[in-house]
Amino acid sequence: MDSVGRKVVGGGTDPFGSFVAAVPAGEYRLAVSAEGYAPYRAAATVAESSLTSLGDVTLQVAQPPELPAPGDWDIEPTHSSIGFTARHIGLARIHGRFNSFAGVLRVAEDIEQSAMHVVIDAASIDTNVRMRDDHLRSPDFLDVARFPTLEFYGDRFAHRGGNRWAITGALSLHGVTRTVTLDTDYLGLGHGMEGEVRAACRATAELHRDDFTVSWQTMLARGIAVVGPTIKVELDIQIVPKG
């Protein structure tokens, strides 16, 4: 960034770990980051018609956030959300959420042996448009009269480095069960307003509607699907010790 905070240049290193950029003379602030390492920041002064080098930059391994203690933890719905995004007529994105859900995480001594179970009330789907929500609850989509819940049981926790995890398990939706992996960023531990311990994470997954036989479709005159074939699911979760 330059002296007034504007981003001037960015990018990655070459295969040998070098990064070169041509910038006007002036004062700059530099930030270097890499997955699993603490960011490096420095100031640099570039003189007119000269080469400025920072030399070798060494990144320090980042300390991973503290993990939740072994035991049972509940999803705290007031400060959690389960949302989704779908494409509409190949252009806009429609955002929605489920307003009612519950879940428990059993943290093992070996964190990778942990397990979680989440139950979502299918009828609580909400896109802020009543007519659309009624259609999503109908047999064309979730068919909530026959399949009142969506359930995820995750039993494979794999550490991918830094604060990144993969949680793999079985998702049951619309009477069909498929293996799904949640790409998860663990955000660490904190304390709530009453001093209670909390842990938090963000997770995403991409679902293909046809995998769960949610296959209703209408085409526009040009052959463009009204509803896209994939759904992006986004979770922001806080957990508290069960008690």
Q: Which sequence ranges carry the predicted segments?
A:
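Low-complexity, acidic/polar, glycine-enriched regions of mature
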Residues: 2-243
